[in-house]
């Protein structure tokens, strides 16, 4: 009798699992800029542990080209405010369409799994970004970042190549001038801490 019940349970479970469920098709090419509370250069980006606990940061992802199941994502910007491994807030530019907003939300567990896991909110909001050869500024409703490029030999920007994560390719080293966050539950104010810009290419296999 137990054998029959076990076999029945297996059959029911197999019937409940869709066979050959279609996986979404997506890809993204983006410019990334971030400042966090770690020292320069942030050990997290090399696969290490934060130099400042908890690691507090703001990252802007500016999608240059990409799509999710046919929805064009070119021009979409989002800011992730985070306390690493604890929580995140994700703000998508209020210029996106409803269709793009839904596509970004669907893509969160695929492209932004770490941030998605502890996500406290996912909302549209005004986002600004200014980029020059030596300076990057960006802001959202609760956070702002102003950082300057770090120069090395012969006055050229410091570059780090072939970091472990795809997120950190063509990495240019920056240092924060001002990095702030203020909300009802969390706040910070950092300067002289790590910052960077990078290129990120990712997508479904």
Question: What kind of region is each of these model predictions?
Answer:
Residues 6-16:
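Bacterial N-terminal signal peptides
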